[in-house]
Amino acid sequence: YYYYIRRIVIRPAEVLHDAASALIKNDMDDLENFSISVKTGDEFEELADAFQFMTVELSEYIKNLTVVTAERERIGAELDVATQIQSSMLPCIFPAFPDRREFDIYATMNPAKEVGGDFYDFFMVDERHLAIVMADVSGKGVPAALFMVIGKTLIKDHTQPGRDLGEVFTEVNDLLCEANSEGLFITAFEGVLDLVTGEFQFVNAGHEIPFICKSGGFYEPYKIRAGFVLAGMEGIRYKAGTMQLEPGDKIFQYTDGITEAMNSRNELYGMKRLEETLRKNVHKAPMELLPEVKADIDSFVVSAVQFDDITMLCLEYRARMEGIS
């Protein structure tokens, strides 16, 4: 009777125990070769079969998990690289021109969860001309970040004293089309302010229209032709426009990450709310204004995840440059 009990009950239980112990001892590193055989025709055999099936399923799960984890790590590393590329290319030391009394400028870029290709720039074209750039590259990750570097570099290199900005964007567009294997495009706005006369020459390539605040007035959207995006089609000709700025006037430019910021109810922040926020803070200097706009966006979206960068720039023309005719 003992041997019967041992064969029918104890031995199958020992086989199951030994199999479980082997899995633990080997840290489940060899699940593919795991095998357990109990032929009793009862619940022990059913349990052994279930054990065998479980190890096969677990082996497949671990394989898939390894692949998914590796892919997530790759994507994470790529996004880190893209973030570093993006942030390293943007001027971020303020005040940017501490010795210049003719103007004040401030800009910020808050990257989204998925790194995009927003960029801004500002630089002296020569002693009396200040250029500002606001742009948004389509796509995400490293390709968008690298295309951002190319676009930003080309715009700055081709913005030369006395050049028409329409010609600048026409040349930049053709060059970008040649180096566009990913099929990306850039919306961009560039303006050059003559610090002596106050003339502001600008060109727009499918970008958001700026807000202008005249001295003593309020921020209002400045209606200009959007133009065609950069890198979208070769041979496009761009036309520059001009406006006259007086001391005390301000320009606010931004990317669509602001107006398209969305809350948990799928409502957009929108142009109207942006204009209201700018009007409430009309007397603030650029470095004070931009944090107020960002704070209002944050209060609107609350905890909703944003998938587009939030980028903005404000330029205040404070005084005419003297000593140059």
Name each model feature, range by range.
Residues R163-V168, N281-L290:
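Short, charged, surface-exposed loops that flank catalytic or proteolytic processing sites
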Residues Y1-I5, K156:
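Hydrophobic alpha-helical membrane-associated segments
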Residues N64-F252, V302-S325:
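… and, occasionally, acidic/histidine-rich disordered N-termini of signaling adaptors
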Residues E292-S303:
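Low-complexity, intrinsically disordered Gly/Pro/Thr-rich segments
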Residues I212-G216, M262-L268:
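Cytochrome P450 core scaffold surrounding the K-helix E-X-X-R motif
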Residues I8-N26, D30-V56, I62:
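HAMP signal relay modules and closely related sensory coiled-coil linkers
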Residues E267-V282:
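Divalent-cation-assisted or electrostatically stabilized phosphate/pyrophosphate-binding catalytic cores
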